[in-house]
Amino acid sequence: MSFSKREAGDVWSILFVTGIVTACLFAGVSVLMRMRFPDKSRPEWMLAGLIVLGVFAIWYSLVYVRGWEGAALGMLGFNVIFGAIAGYLIDKAIRRYRKR
């Protein structure tokens, strides 16, 4: 099976969209939780959980899956990690803006 440039570009767009969706979901859930539970600090736990899941996906792709499928799973893990970090930073920016 051969991959054309169009098919390879489709894979990258899926990975970028996954990272963006993860960031948006993290920021949205974080803002909603801050509105419902202003005393509790849960975004840090969500960030830690998503980073652990991303690292686990990368480890699993390296050890068990391997090959191109493993590379795609590893990229998905990186996107979850960076999406979670971006969502956390977006949440911090929103909270700073709301305080003003």
Swiss-Prot record:
Keywords: Cell membrane, Membrane, Transmembrane, Transmembrane helix. InterPro entries: YesK-like. One of its GO terms (cellular component) is plasma membrane. The keyword Transmembrane helix applies. It is found in: Cell membrane. It is a multi-pass membrane protein. The chain crosses the membrane at residues 11-33, 45-64, 68-90. This is Uncharacterized protein YesK. The gene is yesK.
